[in-house]
């Protein structure tokens, strides 16, 4: 006899990413997956005739587990990518999806691909595209409108076809998305984009923005199945009583905590870490620091990390992930791992350079540099100084404190990815692994 599961029964054991230590098996119930799936249906992820989803995240990842639950329970079609994320744009051209879920790095590739196409246009066409984009951006900022009766069919159709021509909804998560990139893609592709936030422990659906919200830089509010609170973090000077220094408006800040039916049942065979993660009142402590934007409907903005912080010699706290998210916008930086030794007073970093921009700079030194040999120059001090200079300029623009500026850098010939276990499938750096892998290099940077 088949016995149907109860809401509290375990549906899946989903392992955490391992960015802060060993992966832990989060026990996710049927009820948690069901209620979070229902939340997804209220984000714009609603199905119409002819919809299709492009799947590329690994099914061991909680986000894809959640989306598959939504798709399969509704009998909805989806296509699976070819297996190489570098070919994702080509896969989209073939499948012609209407829905996508991705991390910011993937959307950054789309953004760069569109700009590469625009760059190849003649003067007149390039001006037409620029005018169309600017007018649509203006309309979106004023009225929240993504489509245009003239520009879309006559000018922007080839751009829209870069991802198949039918995309209408994109969900982004895992890391903050550049507001400029987000709004550009919204109007260039005539597609809604929402930002989500969550962890394996809360079934990936803790907080999500609305598709009609044209203000970037936040992650929206709680899914209706969740309670959210902010916990004071005295060590980092974050308090729920904080106020905006300029306006005096209440601007609470603190560690984001969540509870509700979407919460996991605990870590498999790991009562110690379960008790560390969930307090006696049932609140899961995320390790992320949030700020409530009281002037914008109490939307939440991620501003820092409680976990993964460390102290330098003078006692200053450093949140490396916050710095990395900004430094990856540097024109030479594809990936970056920021590291600090508590016995030193400055930061160092391992950088995976961007191929195109790095080659362009190296050609000013040696005209024979090409795609096949550019990595041979990664020990060149002139290149390192150029990258450090660009990173410092970017940091200053983003209000880096003096001790947050990277002083020395190593250029890595290999990327951080799941294959070498230096990153998760969503490209979050596994800090313990990266520290171990680059230990000698990091030590040498400090000993130079």
Regions found by a protein language model. Give the residues of each.
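Conserved pre-ATP/AMP-binding loop-to-beta segment of ANL
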Residues: 1-15, 22, 46-52
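Conserved AMP-binding A3 loop
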Residues: 11-37
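Conserved ATP-binding/catalytic segment of the ANL
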Residues: 16, 236-239, 246-312
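Active-site loops of AMP-binding adenylate-forming
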Residues: 30, 177, 186-192, 199-217, ...
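Conserved AMP-binding/adenylation subdomain of ANL enzymes
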Residues: 34-52, 59-155, 166, 188
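Conserved A3 ("GATE") glycine/threonine-rich loop of ANL adenylate-forming enzymes
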Residues: 61, 105, 167, 173-181, ...
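Conserved C-terminal "lid"/linker of ANL adenylate-forming enzymes
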Residues: 335-337, 388-448
């Amino acid at each position: 006899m088949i016995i149907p599961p109860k809401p509290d029964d375990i549906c899946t054991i989903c392992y955490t990413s391992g960015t802060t230590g060993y992966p832990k098996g989060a026990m996710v119930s049927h009820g948690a997956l069901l209620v979070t799936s229902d939340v997804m249906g209220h984000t714009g992820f609603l199905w119409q005739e002819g919809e299709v989803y492009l799947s590329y995240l690994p099914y061991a990842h909680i986000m894809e587990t959640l989306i598959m639950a939504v798709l399969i329970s509704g009998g909805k079609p989806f296509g699976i990518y070819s297996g190489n994320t570098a070919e994702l744009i080509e896969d989209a051209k073939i499948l012609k999806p209407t829905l996508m879920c991705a991390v910011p790095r993937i959307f950054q590739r789309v953004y760069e691909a569109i700009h590469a196409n625009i760059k190849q246009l003649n003067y007149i066409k390039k001006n037409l595209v620029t005018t169309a984009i600017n007018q649509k951006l203006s309309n979106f900022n004023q009225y929240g409108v993504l489509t245009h009766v003239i520009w879309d069919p006559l000018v922007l159709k080839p751009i829209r076809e870069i991802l198949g021509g039918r995309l209408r909804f994109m969900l982004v998560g895992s890391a903050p998305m550049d507001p400029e990139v987000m709004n550009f893609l919204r109007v260039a592709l005539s597609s809604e984009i929402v930002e989500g936030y969550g962890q394996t422990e809360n079934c990936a659906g803790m907080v999500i923005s609305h598709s009609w919200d044209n203000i970037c830089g936040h992650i929206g509010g709680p899914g209706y199945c969740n309670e959210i609170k902010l916990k004071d973090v005295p060590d980092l000077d974050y308090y729920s009583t904080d106020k905006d220094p300029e306006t005096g408006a209440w601007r609470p800040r603190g560690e984001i905590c969540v509870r509700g039916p979407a919460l996991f049942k605990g870590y498999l065979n790991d009562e110690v870490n379960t008790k560390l993660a969930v307090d006696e009142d049932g609140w899961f402590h995320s390790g992320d620091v949030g700020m409530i934007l009281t002037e914008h409907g109490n939307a939440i903005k991620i501003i820092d990390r409680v976990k993964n912080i460390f102290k330098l010699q003078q006692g200053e706290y450093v949140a490396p992930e916050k710095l990395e998210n900004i430094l990856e916008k540097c024109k030479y930086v594809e990936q970056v791992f920021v590291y600090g030794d508590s016995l030193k007073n400055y930061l160092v970093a391992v950088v995976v350079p961007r191929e195109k921009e790095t080659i362009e700079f190296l050609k000013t030194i040696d005209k024979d540099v090409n795609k096949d040999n550019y990595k041979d120059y990664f020990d060149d001090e002139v290149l390192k100084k150029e990258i450090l200079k660009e990173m410092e300029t970017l940091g200053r623009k983003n209000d880096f404190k003096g001790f947050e500026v990277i002083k020395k850098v190593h250029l890595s010939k290999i990327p951080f990815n799941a294959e070498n276990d230096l990153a998760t499938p969503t490209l979050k750096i596994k800090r313990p692994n990266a520290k171990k892998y680059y230990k000698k290099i990091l030590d040498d940077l400090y000993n130079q």
